[in-house]
């Protein structure tokens, strides 16, 4: 259940604690299987042409998305609050000078180190639900974008990642259906990730309407929404994702600063 004692600093402390273990499962160029199968196709469906554009990867983690964007010609700045993740990003970006990627340490809730209107595009991949103050982050992204600039961000789908959720199974262990409960109980809760750890990562649960209303109140114009669905051709190399056709783990928004 939710715990008011958790904040962004505690969330990042846990990311630092588990960074090496989590990143071990991530391909340096494509990310983990969920990103490969679901998130990357959705993000790049919504992103405009990034060639020659100033792009902020807000919450860049180990930097795989920075590297993908830079190879498409983007001028990339990656920001993350986890110093351990940034250290890994530096290790994995061997050709950083050629790619022109700039990695900075910073909290996405307070990006004062970056100038107003300094980016054409902001992308934030699975970050906002890790922050205690998503409104501050969205207001910061709005400030950093030029007029007409685009924000594309993904989050754990609030409807299916409520404080209580998971597969309900029969006596033989077969999956019957995905259950969610306490959807309207907003706040932080501890996840069972990594699975073998006594100290899990923290997710700040908010309703879907909370996210949408905050976007509109910040001044963004909603352009598109995608609930990523795995392509049939991805099920052969990743058969475990077939059950995920029964619900949506993620939701991806495309919004614009007028």
Segment roles from a protein language model:
Residues 121-134:
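A short SAM/SAH-binding and catalytic strip from SAM-dependent methyltransferases
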Residues 202-225:
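Short alpha-helix
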